[in-house]
């Protein structure tokens, strides 16, 4: 397992950045760099299950399943992956799904003098690392634009 880290400084209060990152409508906008049509289904509450989805080539929802394992509003949220969604069906048993179990995606937020720093720390495997290296900087730039607008 590899770890990747990305960060951005945003000229906006931390609560605004937190809300922009995690609310449904704005989430759909800033995550489009990962895949057009990206969205989540579920809840960012402690122990909430989230499905991070986008339409696959046939239009069926596909993506990752995670559980919120730590949350401090306006400071930190950690999602641990527990499987994947393939063709609209939850999969926690295939080899690919099992390889995801236990990987984490963490968002840290800190504010100083009206500038919020968002840091993303994510576990990954070799096959996903290149995609993350490409998509996260674009997504964080979109988040910055949304929060500063």
Residue ranges, per PLM feature:
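Hydrophobic ligand-binding cavity/cleft-lining segments
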Residues: 1-38
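Intrinsic-disorder/low-complexity, polar/charged segments enriched in Ser/Thr/Lys/Arg/Asp/Glu/Gln
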Residues: 3-9, 14, 49, 63, ...
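Generic detector of contiguous secondary-structure segments
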Residues: 6-13, 29-31, 54-75, 130-132
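Hydrophobic pocket/interface hotspot
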Residues: 17-21, 27, 50, 68, ...
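Hydrophobic-ligand binding "helix-grip"
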Residues: 41-43, 58-113
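Short coil-to-beta transition motif at edge beta-strands of beta-rich domains
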Residues: 44-52
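Short, solvent-exposed aromatic-acidic interface loops
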Residues: 82-87, 121-127
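A conserved amphipathic terminal alpha-helix motif
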Residues: 98-101, 117, 123-149
């Amino acid at each position: 397992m590899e770890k990747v880290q990305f960060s951005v400084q945003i000229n906006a209060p931390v609560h605004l950045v937190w809300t922009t990152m995690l609310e449904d409508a704005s989430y759909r906008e800033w995550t489009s760099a990962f895949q057009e049509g990206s969205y989540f289904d579920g809840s960012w509450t402690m122990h909430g299950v989230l499905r991070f989805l986008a339409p696959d080539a046939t239009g069926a929802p596909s993506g990752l399943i995670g559980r919120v394992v730590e949350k401090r509003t306006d400071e930190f949220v950690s999602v641990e992956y527990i499987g994947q969604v393939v063709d609209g069906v939850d999969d926690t048993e295939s080899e690919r799904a099992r390889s995801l179990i236990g990987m984490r995606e963490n968002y840290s937020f800190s504010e100083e003098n009206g500038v919020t720093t968002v840091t993303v720390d994510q576990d990954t495997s070799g096959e996903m690392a290149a995609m993350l290296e490409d998509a996260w900087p674009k997504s964080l730039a979109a988040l910055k634009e949304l929060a500063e607008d």
